[in-house]
A protein has these predicted regions:
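Bacterial N-terminal signal peptides
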Residues: 7-17
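Detector for the c-type heme attachment site
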Residues: 23-35, 39, 159-172
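Short cysteine/histidine-rich metal-coordination sites, predominantly Zn2+-binding motifs
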Residues: 39-49, 177
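Short secondary-structure junctions and interdomain/linker hinges
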Residues: 44, 61, 65, 127, ...
Length: 177
């Protein structure tokens, strides 16, 4: 039990160290803990979208759900989505990825500093387990723009709903005005 408590304190310490500074202050003295943390799920819980972190199929693949049609593709190093919803098409850039197993979700910056959880997620499980596919976050519901569950509504806003628990060293600078 004592070892578990010590390990938890070490992980909490390292999480604050990694988030609070980009230098090697913590890592130089705590190499084993650093190594353990880098191999943990927490190290991969949220990351900038890039070729190393994005698991979803962005090879011009289409996913549809009721009135939504998403086309996932790449341009240079950017991961893009054309979302057609109720006849209107908009292009979005994936800013961040959330998670890796068994699914990966994507954060879209819809306006400066305002991040929303995209309405489709990637099932990262192996194909023989039903994975390697896009699916709607609310599979059995046609979520309309005025619905509280719609991806552009406050319940799907990373800044207000997700950031407190899913990020470290959070500084709130987003202003709705």
């Amino acid at each position: 039990m004592i070892n578990i408590i010590k390990s938890l304190f070490a992980i909490l310490f390292l999480c604050s160290c990694f988030s609070a500074s980009a230098n090697d202050e913590c890592q130089s003295c705590h190499q084993k803990q650093t190594s353990d943390w880098k191999q943990s799920d927490h190290a991969s819980s949220m990351a900038l979208a890039n070729k190393d972190t994005v698991l979803g199929d962005f090879s011009n693949v289409t996913a549809t759900h009721f009135s939504q049609k998403a086309v996932f593709y790449k341009e240079k190093d950017a991961f893009l989505v054309d979302l057609t919803e109720q006849g209107t098409k908009k292009t979005y850039t994936v800013s961040y990825v959330f998670g890796f197993d068994p699914l990966q979700q994507y954060l879209i910056e819809v306006e400066e500093g305002k991040y929303q959880v995209f309405p489709f997620a990637w099932d990262s499980r192996p194909k023989n387990q039903g994975g390697q596919r896009w699916y709607a976050n609310y599979a059995n519901e046609d979520v309309k723009p005025n619905d509280r569950l719609h991806w552009l509504q406050p319940l799907q806003n990373w800044n207000g709903m997700c950031a407190d628990c899913h990020s470290d060293n959070l500084k709130r600078n987003y202003n709705t005005e």
